[in-house]
Design a protein with these regions (language model features):
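Short, surface-exposed, charge-dense and proline/glycine-enriched linear segments
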Residues: 60-74, 113-116, 137-145, 162-164
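Short, conserved beta-strand edge motifs with alternating hydrophobic and charged residues
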Residues: 83, 121-123, 160
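Glycine-rich phosphate/pyrophosphate-binding loop and the adjoining helix
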Residues: 29, 135-139, 144-181
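N-terminal beta1-alpha1-beta2 submodule of the flavodoxin-like/Rossmannoid cofactor-binding fold
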Residues: 1-107, 170-181
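Generic secondary-structure boundary/loop-capping signal
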Residues: 41-45, 111, 152, 160
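Short, glycine-/small-residue-rich phosphate/pyrophosphate-handling segment
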Residues: 108-156
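Hydrophobic/aromatic residues located in beta-strands of well-ordered beta-sheets
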Residues: 3, 34, 119, 157-158
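A short small-residue
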Residues: 1-3, 124-127, 161-167
């Protein structure tokens, strides 16, 4: 399987970056072909422009060169993995902007849907699982991404995995890396 791994963190040497590397290694070890999209590292601009807004009157929309390049990258893969820290109970703005600009009408929803077989979101959380459950954040974030994005765009096999305690010291980072593999 060809898998697009999208990382959304400003520091490549962060735990999010290390988890991304572990995911890439795990995919290669499983015989899958992984392609990395490091949104910050590549300088992706998350701001949508009029050129990239959905065109509700046409199914033959032309997008900016930057977005068309991302669409092609998205479409040449069979699966997608999003790796990101959870900030303010959601994913980073750069990832939201990437989805807004690239997962566009008649690309990911509308007259056409994504053809990806599977999608996985890996969210790194500083808080523990009981904190998320107590306030309902766990189901809210999962519903937003799995149902509101993956399923809405035609990816029936989508799931969300939390890696809790990402800012805990000691052995926790090593345990999270092991879990990611």
């Amino acid at each position: 399987m060809k898998v697009l791994v999208v990382m959304a963190h400003p520091r490549r040497d962060s735990l999010t970056g290390q988890i991304t590397d572990a995911v890439m290694t795990g995919l290669a070890d499983a015989g899958d072909e992984a392609e990395l999209a490091d949104l910050y590292g590549e300088g992706f601009d998350p701001l949508i422009t009029p050129a990239d807004e959905p065109d509700w009157g046409s199914v033959n929309k032309s997008y900016s060169h930057a977005v068309q390049t991302e669409i092609e990258r998205l479409q040449r893969n069979d699966g997608i993995i999003l790796v990101f820290p959870i900030w303010w109970w959601s994913f980073p703005a750069i990832l939201k902007g990437w989805i807004d600009r690239v997962w566009n009408k008649d690309i990911a929803y509308g007259s056409k849907f994504l053809s990806h077989k599977r999608a996985l979101a890996i969210g790194l959380s500083a808080s523990d699982a009981p904190t998320y459950a107590k306030r309902g954040y766990d189901t809210a974030i999962e519903t937003q991404i799995v149902t509101g994005i993956f399923d809405f765009c035609g990816i029936a096999d989508g799931r969300f995995e939390y890696l809790h305690g990402s800012t805990d010291g000691g052995e926790r980072p090593a345990l999270l890396l092991h879990e990611a593999r």
